[in-house]
Design a protein with these regions (language model features):
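Secretory-pathway glycoprotein ectodomains that are cysteine- and/or Ser/Thr/Pro-rich
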Residues: 1-131
Length: 131
C-alpha cells in the first residue's frame, strides 16, 4: 500500500550490502519513504529456521517515535546497528510501514487499528545469504 524501500548499510564501509553477507557483519537499516505521509517503520528478520526477530527495538515509553520516517525522505537508523550471526544462514528481511504507532511484535497476527478494522501497510522484502 505504501511506496517504501530499504537497504542494509555496512557499519564499517558505509556502503550498501549485497545479497551475500560475510558472517558477523555489522550493519544498520536505511529506509526510503516515497509517500506524502509520515510513517512508522520496522524490519522483521526471518532466518532459515523460521525464527523471527524485530531489528528495531521498542522504546521504553512505547511511543514508537524513534521509528518515524518523514514523508518523501530517506532515513538511516545508525543508532540501532545489528550484527548477522557467525553461522551460514538464509535471511528474509521484511520492511513494514504504517501510519499509526504499532507494537511491531504483533506482526504474527493481522494488524488492526483501534478495533476499527485492518490498516494499510507498506511492505518491502529482500533476501540475504550469510556465508
Amino acid at each position: 500500500d505504501y511506496d517504501v524501500q530499504f537497504e542494509l548499510i555496512d557499519c564499517t564501509t558505509g556502503l550498501p550490502l549485497e545479497d551475500h553477507i560475510a558472517p558477523n557483519t555489522s550493519c544498520y537499516l536505511r529506509v526510503t519513504n516515497r509517500t506524502p505521509e509520515l510513517l512508522y517503520m520496522n524490519l522483521l528478520d526471518i532466518d532459515s529456521k523460521g525464527n523471527k526477530y524485530l531489528v528495531l527495538p521498542m522504546d521504553a515509553a512505547a511511543t514508537c517515535a524513534h521509528l518515524l520516517v518523514p514523508a518523501m525522505s530517506t532515513w538511516s537508523f545508525k543508532a540501532e546497528p545489528f550484527i548477522f550471526g557467525d553461522e551460514p544462514s538464509d535471511e528474509t528481511l521484511l520492511l513494514m510501514a504504517v501510519r499509526e504507532p504499532v507494537d511491531f511484535s504483533i506482526v504474527m497476527d493481522t494488524i488492526k487499528t483501534g478495533g476499527q478494522g485492518t490498516m494499510r501497510v507498506g511492505l518491502n522484502r529482500r533476501f540475504y545469504q550469510v556465508k
